[in-house]
């Protein structure tokens, strides 16, 4: 059993972090926190607007601050942005403050799930498939390094993925938020 004050979901866009995260939070009676939403709330601007005005570097700065703020808490299910693992300080904080679940998804499944999504700044290009392959090649080793548990979400609906995780977490994650 791995004791941790928070349950943290990592993985690429389209893996199901928000959808599965909400379901898991309800199942485990945890507060659901979406780091991307925390960024939007703190900045007072949408993620595409932040990217437009500050670039990816500016966005990552907002992300680092929001993640640090969120992970001060406990008893939360935290859904991170896909690129949160790029920063070594973020990785250290994530590892220290939670039980980390990597929701893996194939590029083919990402393309299907994100086909109509216009809110992803990194995908506002004609070569979406190549972008996703490049992101996966760079980020997958970082996700794997951090993960306490990995679930491939390709074959599952959000409900089925949640059910799979409930079973796996019952034997691997020890809640630490219920004491102190």
UniProtKB/Swiss-Prot annotation:
Alphabetized UniProt keyword annotations: Amino-acid biosynthesis, Aromatic amino acid biosynthesis, ATP-binding, Cytoplasm, Kinase, Magnesium, Metal-binding, Nucleotide-binding, Transferase
Catalytic activities: shikimate + ATP = 3-phosphoshikimate + ADP + H(+)
Cross-referenced SUPFAM superfamilies: P-loop containing nucleoside triphosphate hydrolases
Record-listed E.C. numbers: 2.7.1.71
Positions bound to Mg(2+): 18
Binding-site list for substrate: 36, 60, 82, 139
GO cellular component, one term: cytosol
Binding residues annotated for ATP, in chain numbering: 14-19, 120
InterPro entries hit by this protein: P-loop_NTPase, Shikimate/glucono_kinase, Shikimate_kinase/TSH1, Shikimate_kinase_CS
Family recorded in the similarity comment: Belongs to the shikimate kinase family.
Role description: Catalyzes the specific phosphorylation of the 3-hydroxyl group of shikimic acid using ATP as a cosubstrate.
Protein name (record): Shikimate kinase
Species this chain originates from: Stenotrophomonas maltophilia (strain R551-3)
């Amino acid at each position: 059993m791995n004791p941790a004050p928070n349950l943290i979901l990592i993985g690429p866009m389209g893996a199901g972090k928000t959808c599965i995260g909400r379901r898991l939070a309800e199942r485990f009676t945890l507060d659901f926190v979406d780091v991307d939403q925390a960024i939007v709330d703190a900045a007072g601007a949408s993620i595409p607007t932040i990217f437009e005005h500050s670039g990816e570097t500016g966005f990552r700065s907002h992300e680092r601050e929001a993640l640090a703020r969120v992970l001060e808490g406990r008893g939360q299910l935290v859904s991170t942005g896909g690129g949160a693992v790029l920063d070594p300080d973020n990785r250290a904080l994530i590892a220290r403050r939670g039980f980390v679940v990597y929701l893996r998804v194939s590029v083919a499944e990402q393309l299907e799930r994100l086909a109509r999504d216009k809110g992803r700044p990194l995908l506002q290009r004609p070569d979406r498939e190549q972008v996703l392959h490049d992101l996966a090649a760079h980020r997958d080793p970082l996700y794997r390094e951090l993960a306490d548990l990995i679930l491939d979400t390709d074959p599952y609906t959000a409900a089925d993925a949640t059910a799979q995780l409930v079973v796996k977490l019952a034997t691997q994650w020890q809640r630490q938020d219920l004491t102190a």
